[in-house]
Regions:
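Mid-to-C-terminal functional-domain signal that highlights helix-capping/loop sites
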Residues: 1-42, 46-214
């Protein structure tokens, strides 16, 4: 990943991992999976998008149930971030160092603002791209906005809450490369948007809005 990824993207990922429920319902896990697809496919830097998609695929192959808990999502995001740091020959952060940095650069009270700034940034940039690829991102950006408005923005967190996960593995994700398509002979599917997208309405495509806990 390059500077094109931007600190706002990582701020969004880290805050979402902190907001994720400790024991998400099946609906919440499906919502997060779809959010992750839209997030990945709207990354502005093509190589960053490729690297992140590969990281998700590799990690899911190693740990298929990682979306079933906040612990799992926090671990994935920290390992993905350290994977980028390792690739770019930058400092890799321990869990404690990561939390200290996040408390400084992303106070929990400012997290919703940073996520909105990220959404505005990618929307503005993609709307300048009048190609088929650029136009096709519009539904994904709308989906990110809808999930932010109806779910993430209604939740809150404090960084200290994550101290219970101090024993998680934060090392770089192994075997992540831009050409990753399989591992051990088993196909790793690329991320793709489910047909019709995801709607958070009174009765959405995968269940009632009331099933999502605030």
């Amino acid at each position: 990943m390059t500077k094109g990824w931007g600190p706002l993207g990582w701020a969004t990922l880290h805050s979402i991992s902190a907001l994720y429920p400790d024991n998400p319902s099946a609906l919440e896990q499906e919502m997060f999976s779809r959010w992750l697809v839209s997030f990945t496919q709207t990354i502005l830097c093509p190589s960053c998008m490729k690297h992140f998609s590969d990281a998700v695929a590799a990690y899911t192959h190693m740990n298929p149930t990682w979306k079933s808990s906040r612990r799992g999502v926090v671990e994935f995001v920290m390992r993905a971030h350290n994977s980028v740091n390792s690739r770019n020959h930058r400092k890799m952060y321990t869990f404690a160092e990561s939390i200290t940095e996040l408390e400084k650069i992303l106070p929990s009270a400012l997290a919703p603002t940073r996520r909105q700034e990220y959404l505005s940034y990618i929307r503005s940039d993609w709307m300048k791209n009048m190609t088929i690829e650029g136009i096709s991102t519009a539904p994904k950006i709308r989906e990110l906005n809808m999930i932010e408005e109806n779910y993430w923005s209604k939740r809150s967190f404090e960084w200290y809450e994550l101290s219970v996960f101090s024993d998680i593995n934060v090392s770089p994700i192994a075997n992540v490369s831009s050409s990753l398509t399989n591992s051990g002979g088993a196909l790793i599917p690329r991320l793709s948007m489910p047909q019709g997208g995801f709607r958070l309405k009174t009765f959405g495509r995968i269940g009632p809005l009331s099933s999502l806990r605030s």
